């Protein structure tokens, strides 16, 4: 029986990927459709992807599939054909091709079965996820941006919105999608007469969010087909103005795709214009935050002087200090400071 999981260390896999001479293409896709046995589907897809040297992150659930992957350029069309043949529900599926791609987005294939392909926190048995809002194409998006009766709702996390968003788009301040859904309903209660346009990175979150808004009594709901990625691609192809400002945050090694030249965010340490996310180099922290080149040199890639000092300690002492610490997701929130940290480190902006 073939091995259906990775057995090589991350460091070795990354080194192998960086040594590759063939270019790679970063692709994302999703599909809401019923999967009777996600574990069986997972194993079959794992073999298909491995045979084509595909890396990336794939989630499967009874409700469908969500994938962000890296495919050798010479295998892209073969991958597309085999994916379309895998299940009738996947035939003709839109594949979002990365806009700003160095081919180094992933170096290992991780494929997991989950309860949901997007953690939404919805437990209402009457919710119909298929009753979604209407799709918008690039030209229609631009027209809506000029419509005074339209409100654009960003269904991404705060750190994604911080580095890039559509003109005048409303941020739903939250750290997770499950937190955003009830907040979006609450914040829009006074605007039920408005046209609500929802968007996200590649479409998966705003599609479900549009259905949730309709479930909660909002009738004028649209969402951008293919999200920011497809909008920017189509706008450029059609010679339309690209109305997304800044950088599109992505959840892979790149951490962002440049959409426009504007830098709308600031370094979390010194306040200089910057939109480059990084993880703190201290293995006991790994906080996600924005750091400019000057501060990266000053703090040696760390989020604070304390982390800088700790990362310089002998490995044994670092491990001793990390023992017993929680290791949750740590994200810098400009409005609330450090989240989920156990180091007791001051806010990096102070």
Swiss-Prot record:
Its EC number is 1.14.-.-. It is an enzyme of class 1 (oxidoreductase). Pfam families: Rhodanese (PF00581), Rhodanese_C (PF12368), UPF0176_N (PF17773). Residues 146-240 form the Rhodanese domain. Keywords: Oxidoreductase, tRNA processing. It comes from the Bacteria. GO terms for molecular function: oxidoreductase activity, acting on paired donors, with incorporation or reduction of molecular oxygen. It catalyses: uridine(34) in tRNA + AH2 + O2 = 5-hydroxyuridine(34) in tRNA + A + H2O. InterPro entries: Rhodanese-like_dom, Rhodanese-like_dom_sf, Rhodanese_C, TrhO, TRHO_N. Gene3D superfamilies: 3.30.70.100, Rhodanese-like domain. Belongs to the TrhO family. Catalyzes oxygen-dependent 5-hydroxyuridine (ho5U) modification at position 34 in tRNAs, the first step in 5-carboxymethoxyuridine (cmo5U) biosynthesis. May be part of an alternate pathway, which is able to bypass cmo5U biogenesis in a subset of tRNAs under aerobic conditions. PANTHER family: TRNA URIDINE(34) HYDROXYLASE, UPF0176 PROTEIN YCEA. This is tRNA uridine(34) hydroxylase. It comes from Escherichia coli (strain SE11). The gene is trhO.
